[in-house]
Design a protein with these regions (language model features):
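Short, solvent-exposed loop/turn segments at conserved positions within beta-propeller repeat blades
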Residues: 224-226
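Feature captures the catalytic cores and cofactor-binding loops of soluble hydro-lyases/lyases
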Residues: 253-257
């Protein structure tokens, strides 16, 4: 039923509640090939003539079709001519929205709540919200630059990082035993290395509390490639408690597990779990885990966890490293971890993570990372402290690292910064100047000195185009020179050609078409700003199952081009390569002037030959038309006589011009 409210210029629609659509319509469809890349090269030329160089490349190849996701990840590294290629993963994935489940086939990592993190070649079915097997690390860095995360001898992923607290996400971890190695390069070319305990990595998706999970296949990193099968399911789910149980069976290995998650008070939750395993039909062992979580609000969260293992307990993949070599350090005795995050306007941003791991062989790893950031007036301060101690065979190896830096804005697009770092007793300090020339280009100049090294002068620049993100730097001192270069981005092959993007392509994305060869149109997407290529296409990575907004920046359009609306919202199905049309139209805006004796009446309506309204004559007797039609136009002269508008100046197309000034007559 429709009710018209004339006085309010409103129509009221009365619709029965049962006629409203309850199910969300997800954007689906599309097929495409994709690729992501991140390339880095570093060169060092010593004063005496010695030359060293290294290169790293991480790449992801894949395809999206009918909501299937196919991905393959690999990394390639060289150091002074010695090369290493590492295969990280290869899998296919499909979500089933009606069942809230996802199927993965190939080289996968189990996402089961009771037996997570097992790398295998096989198949698994698990709840949709637990589909991501990636990890994230929170690190604190003194200067902007690039970072590499390694596990064993394998490069997992590269990042562009800023000074202060950084979250390094999307890590495809290969082992539950190996710690991570973080290698950073600042804009001066300085290389620093830190060891980060594996325990400090956080999963990017929540492990399932309800629903069922199943996995079967063969271990991927052990030499025997032993077969295994595991399953778990939720037994009880209430507002106060969630109970889950499951089991795992492999060649010479059996395990049973349970887990309980309890809501103690408000947002304070606890979890208890136990796994009992039998190895070789004889050895029996158990592990016990307990955790507390208190996410008070978006500004404060507390977490702590602890686990203890009996001497006879083994995981099914114990004893094997990420690079396939046998490890003797897998007999973990206990693991403790704690973290606190605080964000208050008066105190700033504070983060602390700590971990402690002991093995039955007497090995001991202990570490913590503290970071603090606060803005005083216009000055931003960052403080970071990190310490890691490794004890093996009664021999200790300790890494200590601390830094303090500041940043002072000098205007809208420039700032002055300074820093001081101390790494295992070596002190360095320096200052720099940053200038952002445009949203796509920035450069910096810095100087650094230390007691151990000669003063260093460095410069770097970064450029983000519609095709790729490029960066480079050069540094020089009395002892030699350093050079660096980087390129990162993605590409999508679709039915209309190849489209490059400066951002990595996610598992769900949209292929934006402007329906004409209109380059350099700025488009704001959930993953960042992109620009249309010379064919009028761009790629936008999307978040599945959520509403995503894609918006044209109208200021980036030429004056004679418009995109009606200029904004689109869509909720995509995971794995969709959604075609998104935002058609751009070239318009003929014109300002018509008339001689006094042949001028239409001010306020007169201007119509086409079909009688449709086109515009109104202005009070000064001029006529502005947003899109000048090709056919005849008619108006009225003073006195009411109908007249035809005839151009005395021919139309000339001027690309980029907002409008064209024309002379005309209104002829009776």
């Amino acid at each position: 039923r429709i009710v018209e409210q004339v006085e309010r210029s409103t129509l009221l629609l009365h619709i029965p509640a049962d006629a409203l659509r309850q199910e969300t319509l997800y954007a689906t469809g599309g097929s495409a090939l994709m690729a992501n890349y991140d390339f880095r090269r570093y060169d060092v030329q010593a004063q005496g003539g010695k030359y060293r160089h290294s290169q790293t490349l991480t790449a992801e190849l894949g395809a999206n079709f009918h909501q299937w996701i196919v991905r393959s990840g690999q990394s390639y590294t060289t150091f002074d001519g010695e090369a290493r290629f590492s295969h990280l993963y290869r899998y296919a994935q499909r979500s089933f929205s009606g069942r809230d489940a996802v199927l993965q086939v190939g080289e996968i990592v189990t996402g089961d709540a009771l037996f997570p993190g097992i790398t295998l070649t096989g198949v698994q079915m698990l709840p949709e919200h637990a589909a991501s097997d990636r990890l994230s690390l929170t690190v604190s860095l003194p200067r902007a630059g690039s970072a590499e995360v390694w596990q064993g001898k394998i490069l997992l992923k590269s990042y562009q990082v800023s000074a202060g607290i950084n979250r390094l996400g999307g890590l495809p971890a290969l082992s539950q035993q190996d710690d991570f190695t973080l290698v950073t390069f600042d804009e001066s070319g300085n290389r620093q290395q830190q060891n980060i305990p594996r325990l400090q990595a956080q999963p990017e998706s929540a492990l399932p509390e309800s629903g069922s999970a199943f996995a079967a296949g063969r271990l991927r990193l052990s030499r025997e490639r032993a077969p295994l099968m595991l399953a778990s399911t939720g037994l009880l789910q209430t507002q106060r408690i969630a109970l889950r149980a499951g089991g795992l069976a492999g060649e010479g290995y059996l395990a049973a597990a349970w887990q309980a998650r309890l809501r103690l008070a408000g947002k304070l939750t606890a979890s208890l779990s136990q796994i009992v395993a039998q190895t070789g039909g004889k050895k029996l062992g158990a592990t016990h885990q307990a955790a507390l979580s208190y996410p008070l609000d978006q500004q404060l969260s507390l977490t702590t966890s602890a686990s203890w293992r009996s001497r006879g307990y083994r995981t099914i993949d114990s004893g094997w490293r990420a690079d396939g070599e046998e490890s003797g350090d897998a007999q973990i005795r206990s693991q403790l971890a704690a973290g606190v995050s605080l964000n208050r306007a008066a105190l700033g941003l504070f983060s602390l993570t700590a971990s402690d791991t002991q093995s039955w062989r007497g090995n001991h790893t202990r570490g913590y990372t503290l970071a603090w950031s606060r803005t005083f007036a216009r000055v931003n301060l960052n403080l970071g402290v990190q310490k890691n101690r490794l004890t093996v065979a009664r021999q200790q190896h300790e890494d200590r690292y601390a830094y303090l830096n500041f940043s002072l804005p000098l205007g809208r697009d420039s700032n002055l910064r300074g820093w001081m770092t101390r790494n295992n007793g070596a002190m360095r300090m320096g200052a720099g100047y940053d200038q952002t020339v445009s949203p796509a280009f920035a450069w910096s100049l810095s100087s650094e000195q230390s007691a151990q090294q000669a003063p260093l002068l460095a410069s770097s620049a970064s450029w983000s185009s519609k095709y790729s993100q490029l960066s480079g730097g050069v540094a020089r001192s009395a002892t030699g020179s350093r050079f660096s270069f980087g390129a990162r981005g993605g590409a999508v092959v679709h039915s209309e050609g190849v489209t490059f993007t400066p951002h990595s392509v996610g598992d769900t994305f949209s292929i934006i078409s402007l329906h004409r060869a209109q380059p350099d149109v700025e488009i704001r997407t959930p993953a960042g700003t992109v620009w249309s290529d010379r064919h009028g296409y761009a790629i936008a990575s999307l978040t599945p199952w959520r509403k995503n907004s894609v918006q044209i920046n109208p200021h980036s359009l030429p004056g004679n081009v418009q995109i009606p609306g200029g904004i689109a919202e869509l909720t995509p199905f995971r794995g969709a390569a959604v075609p998104l049309d935002l058609p751009a139209w070239r318009v003929r805006r014109a300002l018509l002037t008339f001689p006094p004796e042949e001028r239409p009446e001010p306020g007169s309506a201007v119509e086409n030959s079909r009688g449709a309204l086109v515009a109104y004559v202005s009070e000064d007797g001029t006529l502005f038309i947003d899109d000048l039609p090709a056919g005849p136009l008619y108006a009225h002269r003073p006195g009411g006589a109908r007249c035809a508008i005839a151009l005395t100046t021919p139309w000339v197309d001027r690309p980029g011009s907002l409008y064209t000034l024309l002379s005309a007559r209104c002829v009776i």
